[in-house]
Amino acid sequence: IDYRKCQASQILKEHGMDKVIPLPELVCTMFHISGLSTQAEVNNHSNKEYGIFQISNDGWCAEKQEDVANSVCGILCSKFLDDDITDDIECAKKILQLPEGLGYWKAHETFCLEDLDQWRC
């Protein structure tokens, strides 16, 4: 699914993300990393990034079922490519607990620190 910004914002709000991070910043970041597409899959050096949040297989999710228990989010990376973004959001909440928060996604600093009016719904 390719979401529109206000669709994405509404779903994020339904899952309490507005209490974690300002939604315009988050939606802007998501747009710049995945185009708000659940099917975005990117090879990034030796890692692969999945879904609307571009969650990395570098410890956050697992490529193989037998590695799921050792991943931070306890999920197969391929699950981030389906149309249900509930599990993506739950994993993103864990990423946002990192000291760098939204800074985990480089696009945030580059594109989403100011002039956020276009990302409001």
UniProtKB/Swiss-Prot annotation:
Binding residue positions for Ca(2+): K79, D82, D84, D87, D88
UniProt xrefs under PROSITE patterns: GLYCOSYL_HYDROL_F22_1, GLYCOSYL_HYDROL_F22_2
The UniProt record lists the keyword Glycoprotein: yes
Glycosylation sites: N44
The UniProt record lists the keyword Transmembrane helix: no
GO cellular component, one term: extracellular region
Occurrences of domain C-type lysozyme (ranges): 1-121
Keywords attached to this entry: Calcium, Disulfide bond, Glycoprotein, Lactose biosynthesis, Metal-binding, Milk protein, Secreted
SUPFAM superfamilies per UniProt: Lysozyme-like (SSF53955)
Gene Ontology BP terms: defense response to Gram-negative bacterium; defense response to Gram-positive bacterium; lactose biosynthetic process
Pfam entry (one): Lys
InterPro entries (alphabetical): Glyco_hydro_22, Glyco_hydro_22_CS, Lactalbumin, Lysozyme-like_dom_sf
GO MF entries: calcium ion binding; lactose synthase activity; lysozyme activity
SMART domains from the UniProt entry: LYZ1 (SM00263)
Subcellular localization(s) per the UniProt record: Secreted
Protein family (similarity comment): Belongs to the glycosyl hydrolase 22 family.
Subunit description: Lactose synthase (LS) is a heterodimer of a catalytic component, beta1,4-galactosyltransferase (beta4Gal-T1) and a regulatory component, alpha-lactalbumin (LA).
Name the UniProt record assigns to this protein: Alpha-lactalbumin
Organism taxonomic ancestry: Eukaryota, Metazoa, Chordata, Craniata, Vertebrata
